[in-house]
Amino acid sequence: MVFMLYDGFQPLDLAGPWQAFSSANEEAGRPLYQLSTIAATPVVSTWEQGLRMQVDGTFEQDGDAPIDMLLVPGGPGADRASAHAETMAWLRRRDAGAPRTCSVCTGAFVLAAAGLLDGRAVTTHWRSADRLRQMHPALRVQDDRIFIESGKYWTSAGVTAGIDLALALIERDVGAALSQQVARRLVVFMRRDGDQRQYSQTLRLQDRVAAPFRDLVEKIEAKLSARWSVDDMADACHMSRRTFQRKFAAHFGVAPTEVLRRLRQERASALQATGKMSKKRVQQHVGPTHNRSAS
């Protein structure tokens, strides 16, 4: 497996997947993945973090040994890498013989610039999705996915989503049991499927407003299964019911009961995705996912 680096790559886009694949080797007790790095120059820099890294080889030194998997991280240098002729030529040549090519975050811009993703469903960091659409209109950009598989190409969202991508690849290659072992080893709270949201409902809500409504969202998240009524929520915000409902609707654009339903539904979907809880247990954990419980 080869990680193609460039000046200005995001170190977490490299470190997260690298550690996951390394841990898979350790958990399996055999070298499932042989990991290496390559770039146009012997040393690359991360720019923002000031880190410098010596790679295992350069494009000029590279021969024709088979590559089973290519992975391109994202980073602020992705645009410059996309315009670098030697980088594009090497990527196209090696992709032609690789059974699988992947990107993390804005690494999708690099693959797209090489013409590898035309007509495919792809994802990237949600902040960069609109720009990817504008620069590469032939792509079908889905900005609310953790990762997407389209043929031999796998693209993922930003930073920690690279770990989710790696865990999915390990499961595909070796099986769910080893992937779960790696997740536990990395102390990953919960493995996320590719179709889960990049940006959680809680963060969406918290980004919109300040206290007391942000604090209310946190309180509800901490006790989702509680019998939250509108009066309970109003009391938590130290408001009368009427004032609370008016201000809440002005901030969020929906009723308090709808926000409660969305938070419960998101948590329920995440728990069900693990396959470890029955539907009944999930409901006990999060409470009812309809609006009739709060009034």
Q: Which ranges hold each PLM region?
A:
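Flexible gly/pro-rich beta->alpha loop and the following alpha-helix that scaffold active-site loops
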Residues: 36-101
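Basic/polar phosphate-binding segments, predominantly the helix-turn-helix DNA-binding elements
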Residues: 219-221, 226-266, 283-295
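Accessory alpha-helical/coil subdomains and C-terminal extensions
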Residues: 174-218, 226
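N-terminal beta1-alpha1 cap of cysteine-dependent amidohydrolase-like domains
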Residues: 1-61
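Catalytic nucleophile loop
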Residues: 90-127
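A conserved active-site-flanking secondary-structure segment within enzyme catalytic domains
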Residues: 117-146, 181-182, 186
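Conserved anion/nucleotide-ligand pocket segment
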Residues: 145-185
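Basic, amphipathic alpha-helical hairpins
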Residues: 171-175, 208, 212-229, 248-249, ...
